[in-house]
Amino acid sequence: MKITVHSSKAVKPEYGACGVAPGCTADVVPLTVLDKANFDTYISVIYAFHPPAPPNAVLEAGLGRALVDYREWAGRLGVDANGDRAILLNDAGARFVEATADVALDSVMPLKPTSEVLSLHPSGDDGPEELMLIQVTRFACGSLVVGFTAQHLVSDGRATSNFFLAWSQATRGVAVDPVPVHDRASFFHPREPLHVEYEHRGVEFKPYEKAHDVVCGADGDEDEVVVNKVHFSREFISKLKAQASAGAPRPCSTLQCVVAHLWRSMTMARGLDGGETTSVAIAVDGRARMSPQVPDGYTGNVILWARPTTTAGELVDRPVKHAVELISREVARINDGYFKSFIDFANSGAVEKERLVATADAADMVLSPNIEVDSWLRIPFYDMDFGGGRPFFFMPSYLPVEGLLILLPSFLGDGSVDAYVPLFSRDMNTFKNCCYSLD
């Protein structure tokens, strides 16, 4: 598969006759404490569409209209008058790349999570600090692949997906839904007096001097990180739920069951000592958990992490139900009180005084003995439609971070789940042998 780039340009908000942003009241949007707690990195995803697809000029025009409603993505990161990190609403533009492939898309489908897919989207290093970079690639058969690369400090997965949806709606000429909510100042005020109920040191924050203690694997083929896509059918998930929910007052969720199962399988594959501590960090969306609720259209980050922890021996020797109980308890703990405790701590002055930094560190390339989970199961990726139909395939880009687990709904649309599992190559055969076992 040879990808040829034909053009690359900055697309700016298209305001039309008015020439200014409607309802614009600020040129700088300070990052919230929840934005700053997230990963300072770019995340890339890939969509595939069957023909027909609108011409590139139509997609570009739709992008310009969508950026009127989402000026953040046409801006740049900088600082505000107080020296705090902020999004500068300078309308510098989002990157728009046009490319072609020399093969029919069917010949390379399904796309595999290898370095080859990196050619289907821009890199975050490609532009002059652009926050959103998009590549549209036309295949020889007429199929279209759209690759997005977005700065995670600007928004979480749900908010970024809302922008993708808005672009498709603007391209079709329909109203943007959900309506974006840009007010980052009103939702996350600290309480008076501050009330820090939970420990946030060592959870969301770590000392600065540990920020660059990156663990790397040794050289050699066995220490290469490879990403394996695992497909869990609806039937497998039903059996897993029945096993994990036995005797419980209500069935456990698909997310909890699949994460518990993969946590155990990955721990077995790694061959951890039974007394070694292992945890799984699960991203928890606070929109519906906070009171008052944060609107679905909120454009920033509203994510903290549940961190169930146990020993490797306890995890693998006890049934999956035990792991589900650990996960359920910790996820439930990340409630309104926890979010507000975090906000109070982040505004208490302790972060600056103690020189703390976010534990969400994109430089960490090896997470063992731990796991981190990004669940995209409830994000409506398959609702995106430029006018030629919804995508028939979606995937994250190649991201070889050992232990970073990404879950998403299968494109089959039948309730099955796809999991992207990065492990050292030396551990992958063992993982493949146990990941479909319910023993």
UniProtKB/Swiss-Prot annotation:
Q: What's the pH dependence, according to the entry? A: Optimum pH is 7.5.
Q: What is its EC number?
A: 2.3.1.64
Q: Which residues form the active site?
A: 152 (proton acceptor), 385 (proton acceptor)
In which domain of life is the source organism classified? Eukaryota
Q: Which UniProt keywords apply?
A: Acyltransferase, Transferase
InterPro entries the UniProt entry points to: CAT-like_dom_sf (IPR023213), Plant_Fungal_Acyltransferase (IPR050317)
Its UniProt entry gives the catalysed reaction(s) as:
4-coumaroyl-CoA + agmatine = N-(4-guanidinobutyl)-4-hydroxycinnamamide + CoA + H(+)
Q: Name one GO molecular function term.
A: agmatine N4-coumaroyltransferase activity
Similarity comment: family membership: Belongs to the plant acyltransferase family.
What does this protein's UniProt record list under function?
Involved in the synthesis of hordatines (antifungal hydroxycinnamoylagmatine derivatives). Specific for agmatine as the acyl acceptor, inactive towards tyramine and putrescine. Has activity with the acyl donors 4-coumaroyl-CoA, cinnamoyl-CoA, caffeoyl-CoA, feruloyl-CoA, and to a lesser extent sinapoyl-CoA.
How does this polypeptide assemble, per the annotation? Monomer.
What's the protein name?
Agmatine coumaroyltransferase-2
Naturally occurring in which organism (per UniProt): Hordeum vulgare
